[in-house]
Each structure stands twice: as structure tokens, then as C-alpha cells.
């Protein structure tokens, strides 16, 4: 799954929160997509290339395919449940071919999912 962010500067302490090996909980529903190009396009809509971000997310149990009820069915939209916990597999690094910073996350098993 993928999530593009055009400007991560509004996310407080981003590089500390998403440091490799850390665990982070996303507190609310989060919309992601199975379509990397759609997420990359969203991330690249940001004016400052150094602030463009692409999350690469390995989900296990918390994600549900909602493309069939989504207003944007062609986006292959998937919804991640609130309270999902992730481990940062690789912290922010620049990906020249994609023109974005990449952060890789994997879902941590929890008793809720």
C-alpha cells in the first residue's frame, strides 16, 4: 500500500517520529492506495521537492479495500483502521527515480486486529 504526502513539514518532529526501528500509531482512519503511481502523483504535487513524501506500507490485518464504495474507485482505495501500529522499516531517504522521500512501514501485530 502507498500514501503520498505533498508536504510533510506540518507533521511535527517528523524525522524523529519516523526514525528507523521506531513504532508509530496512526490514530485515525487513513486512506491509502494499492496504486503507487497515484500516490507518487499526489506526493509530487507539492511545490518543494524536499518535502514530498511517499509512505510504502506493508499491512497485515487492519486494511480494507473500499474502492467499490469510494468516490475515486480508480484509485484502488484502501482504508486503514484507526489505532493501527506500524514499525518504521526504513526511515526517510530520497528516491531519485520517484522524486520523493520514502519511508517504509510495516504493520505490527496487535490484539485488536
Question: What is each model feature region?
Answer:
Residues 65-113:
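Conserved NAD+-utilizing ADP-ribose enzyme module
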Amino acid at each position: 500500500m502507498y500514501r503520498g504526502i505533498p508536504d510533510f513539514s506540518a507533521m511535527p518532529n517528523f524525522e524523529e517520529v519516523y526514525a528507523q526501528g521506531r513504532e508509530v500509531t496512526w490514530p485515525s482512519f487513513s486512506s491509502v492506495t494499492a496504486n503507487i503511481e497515484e500516490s507518487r502523483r499526489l506526493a509530487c504535487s507539492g511545490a518543494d521537492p524536499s518535502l514530498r513524501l511517499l509512505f510504502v506500507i506493508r499491512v497485515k490485518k487492519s486494511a480494507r479495500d473500499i474502492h467499490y464504495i469510494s468516490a475515486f474507485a480508480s484509485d484502488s482505495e484502501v482504508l486503514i483502521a484507526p489505532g493501527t501500529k506500524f514499525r518504521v522499516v526504513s526511515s526517510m531517504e530520497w528516491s531519485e527515480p520517484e522524486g520523493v522521500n520514502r519511508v517504509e512501514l510495516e504493520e505490527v501485530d496487535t490484539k485488536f486486529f
